Amino acid sequence: MTTQVMPDRQQIEALVRQAIRGVVAPQSVPTARFSGAANTPGWVDGKPNLRVSISARHCHLTDEHVEILFGPGAKLIPEKDLYQDGFYAAEQTVMVVGPRRRMLPNVRVLGPTRPFSQVELAFTDSISLGIDAPVRHSGKIDGTPGCVLVGPAGTVQLTQGVIRAARHVHMNFADAEHYGVADGDMMQLVIRSPQCSVTFDELLVRADKAAKLEVHIDTDEGNACNLDSATEVLLQKQPAGHSDCACKSH
């Protein structure tokens, strides 16, 4: 992995002042761009109701980093509930700074806080930042590149934690039984849209008793399949003969 040269203190302080001025409109929160049945969870007509959501670039923060970035005693303020119960897009955003002062302003913070901070980007985002972010599943950040996070009250330099989030599907145990899969298995997602149908292999199953059936893909993947115009989505077991992706072990 190439060595990254981060901005010096003077450059970072200039970026802090820019963040405080709020010169760029806030980044939109992650949204769903296709749903099986009017956004309702549970089962419909005897089948699990599948929802496919595009996850825009975002970050997760520790309690300590929230206070550094937004001030002593600061807490994440929920702005919009996400589809999975207990998770939300916060009011707060940060600026993500990569090598050579390349930056992404107003990156949304998702809550609740975590034991480690992590930044999730699409491939085009990582190119824009000048960071060679690997494809990893959430939480698998060992050996990944870092970045600088800039908030209105301070900065945090991450030594690791910048990833391109691997596509995955959340489901509960009843959903998993329906599809004949278990936590950690790989599935296949077929998205049919006019002149732009795409099949995504290597979709990691993340099964939990309280989860709702929801696929997460990033903005590049959503644009590639023209998800806004999708006429049908099909979630199925990955066909025999397809090898597991290398990212499964990361």
Language-model regions, residue ranges each:
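Protein-protein interaction and targeting regions used for scaffolding, dimerization, and localization
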Residues: 1-46
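Extended, non-catalytic scaffold segments that flank or surround catalytic motifs
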Residues: 3-6, 15, 34, 38, ...
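Short beta-strand-centered segments at strand-helix junctions
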Residues: 51-54, 58-99, 105-152, 157-190, ...
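Solvent-exposed coil/turn segments that connect beta secondary-structure elements
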Residues: 99, 192-194, 238
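Short, Lys/Arg- and Gly-enriched loop/turn segments at beta-strand edges
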Residues: 105, 194-203, 240-246
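Extended, aromatic/histidine-rich regions of cofactor-dependent oxidoreductases associated
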Residues: 224-250
